């Protein structure tokens, strides 16, 4: 995959529950703590190294931000780092929260 793909929250939900992709959330720490998708890895400059160590480059990665804009740049960056399959989640956490309000975790872990 030379270019990331955009997927909607329903596709992201399916991939997450089928465990065919991991989800990273690139929002700021306060926003992440106030609500995030259960199982999402909080990807920051400080956690990038750990994420890359803990995941094989053939792991499919879905990137989520606030509304689906910033995730595109992060998705392209992860491709450039060597990940084979990267997706940007259209609508971001805002869309996730609207579609799956019962599936929102709180806290920093």
UniProtKB/Swiss-Prot annotation:
**Entry keyword Transferase:** yes
Chief localization: cytoplasm
Task: State the Gene3D superfamilies in the record.
Answer: Rhodanese-like domain
Q: Give the EC number(s) under which this enzyme is classified.
A: 2.8.1.1
Give residue ranges for domain Rhodanese: 17-105
Active-site residues, Swiss-Prot/TrEMBL: 65 (cysteine persulfide intermediate)
Looking at its record, which EC class is this enzyme?
A: transferase
Disulfide pairs here are: none
Entry's Gene Ontology cellular component terms:
cytoplasm
Cellular localisation: Cytoplasm
**Single GO biological process annotation from the record:** glycerol metabolic process
The catalysed reaction is: thiosulfate + hydrogen cyanide = thiocyanate + sulfite + 2 H(+); thiosulfate + [thioredoxin]-dithiol = [thioredoxin]-disulfide + hydrogen sulfide + sulfite + 2 H(+)
In terms of InterPro entries, this protein maps to: GlpE_sulfurtransferase, Rhodanese-like_dom, Rhodanese-like_dom_sf, Thiosulf_sulfurTrfase
The reply to whether Cytoplasm figures as a keyword in the UniProt entry is: yes
- GO MF term list: thiosulfate-cyanide sulfurtransferase activity
What SMART domains does the entry give?
RHOD (SM00450)
Keyword annotations from UniProtKB, A to Z: Cytoplasm, Transferase
The free-text function statement in the UniProt record for this protein reads:
Transferase that catalyzes the transfer of sulfur from thiosulfate to thiophilic acceptors such as cyanide or dithiols. May function in a CysM-independent thiosulfate assimilation pathway by catalyzing the conversion of thiosulfate to sulfite, which can then be used for L-cysteine biosynthesis.
Family, per entry: Belongs to the GlpE family.
UniProt protein name? Thiosulfate sulfurtransferase GlpE
> From which organism does this entry originate?
Klebsiella pneumoniae subsp. pneumoniae (strain ATCC 700721 / MGH 78578)
User: Source taxonomy lineage?
Assistant: Bacteria, Pseudomonadati, Pseudomonadota, Gammaproteobacteria, Enterobacterales
